[in-house]
A protein has these predicted regions:
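Short, low-hydrophobicity acidic/polar segments
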Residues: 41-138
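Solvent-exposed, conformationally flexible loop/turn segments
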Residues: 124-128, 201-202, 252-253, 273
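Loop-centered beta-sheet repeat module
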Residues: 130-154, 160-162
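Structural motif
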Residues: 13-26, 145-156
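C-terminal structured domain segments
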Residues: 234-295
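Short, low-complexity, Pro/Ser/Thr/Gly-rich segments in the mature regions of secreted, periplasmic
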Residues: 296-309
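Tryptophan-paired
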Residues: 29-83, 155-260, 309
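Single conserved hydrophobic/aromatic residue that forms the stacking wall/gate
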Residues: 1-9
């Protein structure tokens, strides 16, 4: 790209993850930019294709001055709706938000990742500028697995026996990426539900596990999304817990020590982590009921009170 005097280039960076390393080239997608003046008055919108986003050298065509830049990815998909005034002439940055596209308040599909960024930038006179623009990933992936405990390997768990869901008030994210909790709650259901076989050294199937995968929008520390697992045959709710409290049960102290925001390390952790693998181990009681004896979250074991079903 030929650079001219006074040109301003924007470079996306996605290092707000648990590896603290830039993964934008792996995640790059279409980017929608909304540009406002220093007071937050709307100036213009730019839509950057995925190919251009991967090149990561976006010419902004801005005059010297101070601007507020708002960015989202994924707005070109069917998963999200950008809410903004039809006539943007007199609109302000606070008028912009993104809503999850949900039918009957239920989301049961593999979502296009939603990335968010907002930054105030000052462009100097007559100088070529490079703007480093950090992004945050709002979309989370949960893999929920139910399997027999090591001492109860004769038991199997067919996937059609369970219903999984996460309920949260995070359908609408404001311009500053906070959830508008006055909205109706969303129920996130699996986009994948299936069985997985575990084999012995000879290759024989020794047990079958249930695996569910689902996505959620951004998790906000201090809110109370619910993770629910229901047994279809009995109709009994096997698990109904505060999801964020469960996540924080694992030994996060070491991870929290790495966080840069010393005042809000829990929120930073939730924003950096975007994949959670939660395994529920069970044994069977003498009457044949399933008893949940322990769970692991991203490899960390959490002991819990027995939950019988």
């Amino acid at each position: 790209v030929s650079r001219g005097l006074g040109d301003v280039y924007k470079r996306q960076v996605y290092d707000y993850n648990m590896k603290f390393a830039d993964a934008w080239q792996h995640e790059a997608d279409q980017v929608s930019l909304f540009i406002f003046d220093e007071e937050g008055n709307y100036l213009k919108e730019m839509n950057i294709s995925a190919e251009e986003a991967r090149r990561n050298n976006i010419l902004l065509d801005l005059q010297p001055g101070t601007y507020q830049i708002l960015a989202w990815t994924g707005l070109n998909s069917d998963d999200y709706l950008c809410l903004a005034p039809a006539d943007r002439t007199n609109s302000r940055i606070k008028d912009y938000s993104v809503r999850m596209n949900a039918e009957a308040q239920n989301v049961d599909r593999d979502l296009v990742p939603l990335f968010y960024g907002m930054q105030t930038v000052t462009i100097p006179d007559a100088a070529t500028s490079d703007i480093r623009f950090p992004l945050m990933k709002d979309t989370n992936t949960f893999r929920l697995i139910i399997q027999a405990d090591a001492n109860n390997t004769s038991s199997s768990v067919p996937s059609d026996e369970f219903e999984f869901s996460i309920t949260d008030n995070n359908a609408l994210l404001a311009y500053n990426n906070t959830a508008v909790t006055e909205e109706l709650p969303l129920t996130y259901s699996p986009y994948y539900l299936g069985d997985g076989d575990i084999h012995d050294p000879e290759g024989n199937v020794v047990l079958t596990t249930t695996c569910a995968e689902l996505n959620t929008n951004r998790l906000i520390y201090g809110t109370h999304p619910r993770l629910t697992i229901r047994h279809k045959t009995t109709g009994k709710v096997w698990l109904n817990v505060d999801l964020i409290e469960y996540i924080m049960l694992m030994p996060t102290e070491g991870s929290l020590d790495k966080m840069l925001d010393r005042e809000h390390p829990q929120q930073e952790y939730l924003d950096r982590e975007d994949e959670y693998v939660i395994v529920f181990f069970f044994t069977q009681s003498s009457n044949g009921n399933m008893i949940n004896v322990r769970i692991t979250i991203n490899g960390w074991t959490v002991r819990i009170n027995n939950i019988e079903m």
